[in-house]
Amino acid sequence: KARKPEWMRVPLDTGPTYREIKKTMRDLDLVTVCEEAGCPNISECWNDGTATFMVLGERCTRACGFCHVDTRKPAMADPDEPVRVAEAVERMGLTHAIVTMVARDDLADGGAQHVADTVQAIRARVPDCRVEVLVSDFKGDDASLQVVFDARPDVFNHNIETVARLQRAVRPSASYARSLSVLARAAQAGLVTKSSIIVGMGETDTEVVQTMADLAAIDCDIVTIGQYLRPTSHHLPVVTWWPPSVFGEWKQQGEAMGIDHVEASPLTRSSYHAREAADAAERG
C-alpha cells in the first residue's frame, strides 16, 4: 500500500472559530459535509468562517465508490431544516453559504424543493449572503432541476466527479453524459456553473484534460480538481498520488480553455476557496 505523501498531511487546528461553528451546528441539529466526508480542509475553512451545510439528512440513496457518507435508508426530510440553516448562516456571519445534499432518489422531486426552500430561507434572513448549491443530478428530471434553477442560487454546482471511462466504477447510479446535460441546462438558465473532478482513481492526465474540455464546451464557469483520499478499506483504492505540480498544469490548461476559474491542488475539494472562485466567475 502506497503511503500518503507528505503534501497530503494537514494539521487539525481547532481554533475558537472552529469550535464556535461546531457548537452552532450541534445547537441547531445541522450536518456539515465537512465532517461527514472527513474533509482535510475542515480547519482552514471553519477558522475562516465558512462551512458547507448538508441538507436532507445524513444518509444517501446512492453508494459512490469514493464517498464516506452513510448509505442506509434515509429518514424523512425535516421541513424546519431550511430555517435552521438560515439561522446558522446568520449566527456564523457568512458571506458565502454553501448548501449541499445527499442524493434522495426516494423522494418524488429528488429533494429539489427542499434545496430551493433552503436557498430562499437564507436569502430572506441574510440578504447579502451569496448562496451556492451543490446538488445531485435529480436523475436528469427537468421539473426538479427547474425548481432549483428558479431559486436562482448564485452558483450551481453539480459534480462530474471522474473521467468518462471510470464513471461506472466510481458512481454507478450516475452518468457522465447526464451530469454534463445538467450543467448545460443550468448554464442555459443563466446560472454560474461549477463542477469537480476527483483524481487518483485510475484516470490518465489526458483524460483529466478531456474532462475539462467537455466542461468548458458546456460553458462551465468553475472547475475544482483534488486528490482522492480513501475514506475506508471498503472504498476504492488510491491508484495514483498526483504531485502538486500537475495540478498547477491542469489549472493553466483549464483556464486556457475558457473556464473562468480552476481551483486545483491535492487538497482541493468542491467547496474549497468557493468564495474566491465565485468572485472570479463573476468577473468572468
Identify what each model region corresponds to.
Residues 44-47, 65, 69-72:
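Short functional micro-motifs and their immediate structural scaffolds
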Residues 63, 107, 166, 233, ...:
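Glycine/Thr-rich phosphate-binding loops of Rossmann-like dinucleotide-binding domains
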